[in-house]
């Protein structure tokens, strides 16, 4: 059973603990979340499905955060067409996974200046 769950969670290294004796201090064993007191430390024990939901939620939050940072960075450079710039930036990110959004965006701006408005703010003000 532990192998099946570890595979489902995409975990290579795992520790399986069998609790033979424990005492419920408060609450209900039917809850999907337990707080266990082990060696003067509190540990959180989640139901596998709850853990999967938590991981999926975290993944979605991280994706949304990335999308917002990417959008902010692109829009700050005054793109002619946001979607075109985003497509080029995402392709560049696949090639260089270690570069930051700003590094990739600067590279795209140098290699594809036609994707951005050329605003000389000193002449405007």
UniProtKB/Swiss-Prot annotation:
Organism field: Nautilia profundicola (strain ATCC BAA-1463 / DSM 18972 / AmH)
Name the chain's protein.
UPF0763 protein NAMH_0545
Q: Which HAMAP family match?
A: UPF0763
Q: Which Pfam families match?
A: DUF2603 (PF10788)
**Of which family is this protein a member?**
Belongs to the UPF0763 family.
């Amino acid at each position: 059973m532990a192998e099946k769950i570890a595979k489902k969670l995409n975990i290579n290294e795992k520790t399986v603990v069998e609790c033979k004796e424990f005492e419920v201090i408060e609450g209900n064993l039917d809850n999907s979340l337990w707080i266990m007191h082990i060696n003067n430390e509190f540990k959180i024990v989640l139901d596998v499905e709850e853990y999967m939901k938590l991981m999926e939620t975290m993944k979605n939050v991280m994706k949304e955060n990335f999308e917002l940072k990417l959008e902010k960075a692109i829009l700050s450079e005054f793109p002619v067409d946001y979607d075109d710039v985003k497509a080029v930036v995402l392709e560049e990110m696949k090639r260089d996974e270690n570069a930051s959004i700003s590094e990739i965006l600067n590279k795209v701006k140098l290699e594809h200046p036609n994707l951005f408005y050329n605003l000389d703010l000193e002449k405007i003000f």
